[in-house]
Amino acid sequence: MRLSRFFLPILKENPKEAEIVSHRLMLRAGMLRQEAAGIYAWLPLGHRVLKKIEQIVREEQNRAGAIELLMPTLQLADLWRESGRYDAYGPEMLRIADRHKRELLYGPTNEEMITEIFRAYVKSYKSLPLNLYHIQWKFRDEQRPRFGVMRGREFLMKDAYSFDVDEAAARKSYNRMFVAYLRTFARMGLKAIPMRAETGPIGGDLSHEFIVLAETGESGVYCDRDVLNLPVPGEDVDYDGDLTPIIQQWTSVYAATEDVHDAARYESEVPEANRLNTRGIEVGQIFYFGTKYSDSMKANVAGPDGADAPIHGGSYGVGVSRLVGAIIEACHDENGIKWPEEVAPFRVAILNLKQGDAQTDAACEQLYRELAAKGVDVLYDDTDQRAGAKFATADLIGIPWQVLVGPKGLADGKVELKRRSDGSRETIALAEAVARLAP
């Protein structure tokens, strides 16, 4: 992509309404535009990051055996009355009536609808286990939306729902999602810690929140520092095998949100030097809720003995749009964003330091075409801005690799390669640049 043809409305000043770093940088970098309180238009740069995150989530869900579908944003109110949650959910739910006076709602979550789909088609235990997921926009009418995408009213979410014949099988499904989440967040360059949490209106007796440590987080957290060094399962993890050792390794180390924090246990189990009391950002949460929805909505299957029994369920959410903000909170400096490579809007930025110079233009053009031909996401700054402005833009928007091309270096057949994550620079031969930057 040539920057001269890209829509990148960068702001020079910090927006007054932005209270935290991620919100400020997303607005300054031209990733978002606020259209109403807690509702944003995703501009091209932000949309590219959003799609990268969405794809990682999708790949890891598929790897764990979940199957993708797509449910609508609008749901029938009667489904929620059937489960008993319509009145209990409160003013966060946006209730709507169509022209025929049918009561609808803009879905804040999808337990009811997925249960309705399941019960319409699945009648026997032989079709289980089953895990269905979708990635869809949701709406919760937050009383005080703030912090940009961290606490917006409209948000993109991945929610998965597992269906099993009994509790033992359901807990295996829970463990699969637990491991899938560890891998998902690690691929994004995040250290997300699973912490015991309350189940809230979703229900059930088992839940973990996945928390990214950040002082701007809304959740108070207490954990043993050892959890920061635990290994994340590799790509070869066997989801059909016994995942218990992985789960035990991660859950045996103390880590809890403030809602379920046990101060006495914390002080007795965790050496004082290892205690970490801080704040964090919730980027995902998983639940085992047993027969909560199948009981009320009559979602039964015939078991091995031929008798009908309610299915055991779980739900598993990832805040896809929230993750954009969480990654920025964890990966930034005074100059802007430092995207991990897997989620960066572009992997490489080519900075033409003397636009209009024939040799420099030709070298940049050749490098741009060769990288693009190799499948590299590359942004070529071919604008007539001064070099300092180009450096500032590349740092602000966080491109992991910057190739600085100017007449002085080209006289020796050289370009400068800068790594955004640590600011390191090295001079390399122009002829080597493609091999260095193409994965």
Swiss-Prot record:
Predominant place of localization: cytoplasm
Record SUPFAM superfamilies: Class II aaRS ABD-related (SSF52954), Class II aaRS and biotin synthetases (SSF55681)
UniProt keywords, alphabetically: Aminoacyl-tRNA synthetase, ATP-binding, Cytoplasm, Ligase, Nucleotide-binding, Protein biosynthesis
Keyword Aminoacyl-tRNA synthetase: yes
Pfam families: HGTP_anticodon, tRNA-synt_2b
EC identifiers of the protein: 6.1.1.15
InterPro entries linked to this entry: aa-tRNA-synt_IIb, aa-tRNA-synth_II, aa-tRNA-synth_II/BPL/LPL, Anticodon-bd, Anticodon-bd_dom_sf, Pro-tRNA-ligase_IIa, Pro-tRNA-synth_IIa_bac-type, Pro-tRNA_synthetase
Enzyme class: ligase
GO CC annotation, single: cytosol
PROSITE patterns, A to Z: AA_TRNA_LIGASE_II
Keyword ATP-binding (UniProt): yes
Any one GO molecular-function label of the UniProt entry: ATP binding
GO biological process, one term: prolyl-tRNA aminoacylation
Catalytic reactions on record: tRNA(Pro) + L-proline + ATP = L-prolyl-tRNA(Pro) + AMP + diphosphate
Cell compartments where the protein resides: Cytoplasm
Function: Catalyzes the attachment of proline to tRNA(Pro) in a two-step reaction: proline is first activated by ATP to form Pro-AMP and then transferred to the acceptor end of tRNA(Pro).
Assembly information from the UniProt record: Homodimer.
Family: Belongs to the class-II aminoacyl-tRNA synthetase family. ProS type 2 subfamily.
Name of the featured protein: Proline--tRNA ligase
